[in-house]
């Protein structure tokens, strides 16, 4: 009876500290004064604000001031948060919920799914995921994969920021990052994606491969790249190199625009002292425009052409 009274006092005194309601349900609840833990078994269900966590087994650690600290859920627990018509679900081997800081940490085969209505819009898998309920910021680490609409990503780390309605506002992919969207694949050290404007930037040894309608590859290497899905355009800067068919071009800055009819990447503009190589010819100029269909290029400003391996032979005296 004494332990039950102590348990109730701990829960209610902690709820007085929180600015939100904390509800703990389970088949059995015991308090260990030696371990400073509340142990929960059977049908465990904890509700904090909009967050609900369910598992078969859990424990709650107690601080020295007898306030509830961290709730740990075992045996593949399940958590969910409902915000308007969006639902965030989290599954993992272990879930840890900081009752003071309102941070949820998922460890081991962690998966988060955000649905709008009945439609999944985001699925994230990682070794570990940490979600701050107050700031709506999620940090994922370890073999992070994400599917967002038509975008598939991989990275060592990801930081996802949601808006007040639960929708995505910003996605950061950090370390060995790769992104695939339709026929385009990109890689680099750091990706930043804005789901609202559908614009993406990538820095650090970047590479993009875009497929044309006839299956040919347009490959872009640079220090920095920016992509707009709405305009289907690319901007690259810093040691830019481009390969297409038998063309190779390089320069300090490039812009790639789509064909007005097909919407596919077709026009490439180099600005600054640039060079284009085709077979045995090098053309160097201040500006170079290259088109892929029909395949052609134009060079302007201090143009120099170098033709390699010209064959010559001595004429015989008549």
What are these regions (language model features)?
Residues 1-318:
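Mature-chain termini and adjacent capping regions
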